[in-house]
């Protein structure tokens, strides 16, 4: 046993005399306040996380529903364009004089044309991973991209046109 005036007792008593009890109690009170704030913040973050998870699930379901709707619409449009091509081919066979100015290749329309950019196709396929594969067949052809359609974008709206030519063209129309 150490005598009462041992070096360790003297050292510890001097250290204890340097610490103010009011400062220690103030530090403990500040730590308790911070702990309460952190617990409240943690609880709020947990609630926010739960709410965010629920909203994410709802939005994911809506996104999948809309994606399925878009894929169905694409299939419907593919079917419509196939029917249009079929009707166009029948009309070309029945009335060849009406289609004589259109090149033969535009009547048949190549099946390897894909007006949908690859990034869109990839997006559709990626979003449908959980619901099955999607139809990314390249037989959707936009009239503006088809060589058989005349580009009328250069004509001013409101100007009368006959056979694709306006009255303001340099050449005079027959019968004028």
Swiss-Prot record:
Where in the cell is the protein located?
Answer: Lysosome membrane
Ordered alphabetically, the record's keywords are: Acetylation, Lysosome, Membrane
Domain of life according to the entry: Eukaryota
InterPro entries recorded for this chain? KXD1-like, KxDL_dom
The record's Gene Ontology cellular component field reads: BORC complex; lysosomal membrane
Query: Polar residues bias located where?
Result: 132-145
Output the Pfam families linked to this UniProt entry. KxDL (PF10241)
Instruction: Map out region (Disordered) in residue numbers.
Output: 95-176
Which intervals carry biased composition (Low complexity)? 119-131
Modification N-acetylmethionine, positions: 1
GO BP = lysosome localization; vesicle-mediated transport
Q: How does it assemble?
A: Component of the BLOC-one-related complex (BORC) which is composed of BLOC1S1, BLOC1S2, BORCS5, BORCS6, BORCS7, BORCS8, KXD1 and SNAPIN. Associates with the BLOC-1 complex. Interacts with BLOC1S1. Interacts with DTNBP1/BLOC1S7 (via coiled-coil domain).
Q: Which family does it belong to?
A: Belongs to the KXD1 family.
Biological role: As part of the BORC complex may play a role in lysosomes movement and localization at the cell periphery. Associated with the cytosolic face of lysosomes, the BORC complex may recruit ARL8B and couple lysosomes to microtubule plus-end-directed kinesin motor. May also be involved in the biogenesis of lysosome-related organelles such as melanosomes.
Protein name as catalogued: KxDL motif-containing protein 1
């Amino acid at each position: 046993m150490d005598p009462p005036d041992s070096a360790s007792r003297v050292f510890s008593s001097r250290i204890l005399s340097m610490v103010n009890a009011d400062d220690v109690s103030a530090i403990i009170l500040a730590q308790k306040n911070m702990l309460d704030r952190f617990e409240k913040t943690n609880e709020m973050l947990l609630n926010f996380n739960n709410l965010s998870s629920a909203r994410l699930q709802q939005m994911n379901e809506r996104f999948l529903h809309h994606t399925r709707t878009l894929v169905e619409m694409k299939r419907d449009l593919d079917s419509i364009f196939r029917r249009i091509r079929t009707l166009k081919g029948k009309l070309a066979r029945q009335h060849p004089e009406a289609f004589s100015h259109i090149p033969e290749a535009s009547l048949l329309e190549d099946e390897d044309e894909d007006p949908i950019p690859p990034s869109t196709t990839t997006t559709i396929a990626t979003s449908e991973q959980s619901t099955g594969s999607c139809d990314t067949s390249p037989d959707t052809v936009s009239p503006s991209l088809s060589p058989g359609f005349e580009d009328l974008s250069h004509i001013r709206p409101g100007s009368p046109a006959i056979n694709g030519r306006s009255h303001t063209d340099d050449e005079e129309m027959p019968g004028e």
